[in-house]
Amino acid sequence: MAIILGIDPGSRVTGYGVIRQQGRHLSYLGSGCIRTKVDDLPNRLQRIYAGILEIITQFQPDAFAIEQVFMAKNADSALKLGQARGVAILAAVNQSIPVFEYAARQVKQTVVGTGAAEKSQVQHMVRSVLKLSANPQSDAADALAIAITHCHFNQNLLRVGDPRLILARGRLR
């Protein structure tokens, strides 16, 4: 059993999602958004850090999964996103939680089946996979999708160690 905290970083809205993995079974524990209303960046970053620490304290995750930086058209936005990611990762590392990073296209491919999926498709699939009664908020759905992706890859890593697998010519058979 493992508890995974997924983070969709942002300098104004940071989504989070927490799920429990028991073998192949995933269960929803919580999700939401850390909203920063303060205009100056240092205080926004402090709010993100404090918010993530609060979530870590509440759920005690075993793993921290976060979206990788993508190249934005606006350099200023990309820098702010990188800083938000940095404080989020710092919160996890300071609590000795292992950090895993996943590209946005990889998350969409894993959860929806296509790396070009729309946000509404991600929300729908997260709702379906976790058996939720309603679609989660967009940023929270993205964070839950990141956590689901981590579970998928973590499960595959566990299977690679399975002695029943035969490795031949560079392929799993």
Curated annotation (Swiss-Prot):
Reaction(s) the record says it catalyses? Endonucleolytic cleavage at a junction such as a reciprocal single-stranded crossover between two homologous DNA duplexes (Holliday junction)
**Top enzyme category:** hydrolase
Active site residues according to the UniProt entry: D8, E67, D139
Q: Name one GO molecular function term.
A: crossover junction DNA endonuclease activity
So where does Mg(2+) 2 get bound?
E67
Q: How is the cofactor bound?
A: Binds 2 Mg(2+) ion per subunit.
Predominant place of localization:
cytoplasm
Q: Where does Mg(2+) 1 bind?
A: D8, D139
GO CC annotations, alphabetized: cytoplasm; Holliday junction resolvase complex
Pfam families given in the database record: RuvC
Q: Does the keyword Hydrolase apply?
A: yes
UniProt KW Protease keyword: no
Q: What does this protein do?
A: The RuvA-RuvB-RuvC complex processes Holliday junction (HJ) DNA during genetic recombination and DNA repair. Endonuclease that resolves HJ intermediates. Cleaves cruciform DNA by making single-stranded nicks across the HJ at symmetrical positions within the homologous arms, yielding a 5'-phosphate and a 3'-hydroxyl group; requires a central core of homology in the junction. The consensus cleavage sequence is 5'-(A/T)TT(C/G)-3'. Cleavage occurs on the 3'-side of the TT dinucleotide at the point of strand exchange.
HAMAP family the record matches: RuvC
Say which family it is in.
Belongs to the RuvC family.
Q: What is this protein called?
A: Crossover junction endodeoxyribonuclease RuvC
Q: Which organism is it from?
A: Photorhabdus laumondii subsp. laumondii (strain DSM 15139 / CIP 105565 / TT01)
Highest classification ranks of the organism: Bacteria, Pseudomonadati, Pseudomonadota, Gammaproteobacteria, Enterobacterales
Per the record, the gene is: ruvC
